[in-house]
Amino acid sequence: YKRQVNDDKSFLDDFEVGDIQTSSFDVTWQPVWGEEKDIRNQYNEMAVTLVQKEKNRRMLIRFRLFNDGLGFRYEFPMQKDLRHFIVKEECTQFAMTGDHTAYWIPGDYCTQEYGYTKSKMSEIRGLMNKAVDHQNIASKVIGEAAVQTALMLKTDDGLYINLHEAALLDYPCMHLELDSENRTFQSHLTPDAVGFKGTLQAPGVSPWRTIIVGTEAKDILASRITLNLNEPCKIQDTSWIRPTKFVGVWWEMIAGGGSWDYTSDYPTIKIGETDYTKAKPHGNHRANSQNVKRYIDFAAKNGFDAVLVEGWNIGWEDWVSNRKEFNFDYVTPYPDFDVKELNEYAHSKNVKLIMHHETGSAYRNYERHMDEAFQFMKQYGYDAVKTGYVGPIVPLGEYHYSQPMVNHFQYVVEKAAKYRIMVDGHEAVRPTGICRTYPNLIGNESARGNEFMSRVPLGHTTILPFTRLIGGPMDFTPGIFELDLSKINPNRHEKMKATITNQLALYVTMYSPLQMVADYPENYERFPDAFQFIKDVAVDWDKSVYLEAEPYEYLTIARKEKGSSNWFVGGTTGAQPHIAAFQFDFLDPGKKYMATVYADAADTDYENNQQAYTIRKMAVSYTHLRAPR
């Protein structure tokens, strides 16, 4: 850390230890939603006060040691010679003992939507160009040897290590830059528009830097260090925060060729001036009342909680990549979308509508309209919003993961909480456990999900739980049954690298309290027996057991439905076949259970026979060994 004004003395050296305080902590707490109903937070703490002799400045480093790793952060007490200061760079280093295997994506100031590369640390620099397999309109790749967190590592002798951060608040997002010669990762903070790596004020703290360690890969998945390093819930009444299973007007546009916009008449749009009542509809706008009612009926028939509708509001004809700030007002619907009628229709069927606020990354415009937009939601009965930040930040110069944008994303979550609104953040900074403090942050994207279709690599969903999901749940949008996308859009000649039962398993392995049932209703109606699993699977859990795992190879997880005796087990693999082997000792002894087993058929093939599956029932018990096949 380095001050900016009239002070060339860094916070790197010339320190002596002024004080050391130790303590212990052990408490069990209950999350509003989660992978288990009880989480134990047990650690030993050491707070080391360092005094810089020349300037007589103090900095405290606080360490918390857990059974499965540690967290540490920097703290800056109030003092005479340190009040406001600029961070030029944080120089935290993680020194490795060998050339470990790394599971990584390129460092980027604006996106995490990459496929993962598995390589030795020493190979990262040489593989970087190949690893940059997706540069969207907002991408800003950092350099030849920078990677993102959470970073998963494996030593040659089989130790698993995870590097990340927790409680990212009022601070830029951290990347890691590799010094290959010294086998050391150094923190690399996302700069703001003028190049600063942070503007801090004493008293203040950095986010926690986390190291999770396990002798088995599944130990990493079971760790709750990230959540435990965040503050307890700050929302007094959480009764309105509900895990949600939903359908949506979304896949029709993402994969099917439908449109978010309403007309082709206007080459440019001015909100408040463009008269849509005089426009001729182009006929491909999917967020129309008739189509939305179809999804509402489908949700009601199958017991789903809500319907997401994207493209309902004016402005989509001219919304991104034009350096345009006033692109949406978040309250004016297109002429073919009746807000009042649709919400009344949905509520009459015990279904909610989920609001969509795409910002086009014009974040200041969103902040100006946020109160009005949230009031509009409450007026019509919306209690959840999916936000989006596609494209470069407007005004230009900021990055998605800079301190100002981290603060913006947090502002949205806290403002939404005041209106009792749940948030599903897309294109936002990757999670760091903030959902413990603000559990209305019920979903995040922040990684490559199903919307990438054929560009979701084999094994991708076996590495995401070790990386992206370490910080919080992901809105991966599973449940695609028609995996040959040319069948829904003749112009799209691609197949997803998946099978129907693979898509079912993701509801268990890719944890989220907000799960989308993403495909067309008619594609589920073609496979009612497989669809039954999606109807049955829970979205909130009493207990999770990580049965077996190896990044990029396989993953098997068992979860017990909250408030029920039902268990769900999901398993996925990478490119190589895998026979799951585990015990059912997570079941209650003395009880017999009936298992409904959904599995790929013997001739299932993700390239040529994606929709073949088998379903059978069999009895299992506490002593049952191996997965039923």
Located regions from the model:
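Catalytic domains of carbohydrate-active enzymes, especially glycoside hydrolases
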Residues: 291-310
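Solvent-exposed beta-strand/loop surfaces of large extracellular or lumenal domains
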Residues: 37, 106-112, 597-621
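N-terminal accessory beta-strand-rich subdomains and adjacent acidic, glycine-rich linkers
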Residues: 2-236, 604-605
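Conserved small/polar residues in nucleotide/adenosyl-binding loops
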Residues: 1, 623-628
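Aromatic- and carboxylate-enriched substrate-binding clefts and catalytic-loop regions
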Residues: 310-499
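Catalytic cores of secreted or luminal carbohydrate-active enzymes
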Residues: 506-542
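An acidic-aromatic substrate-binding cleft motif
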Residues: 204-292
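Carbohydrate-binding surface patches
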Residues: 551-589
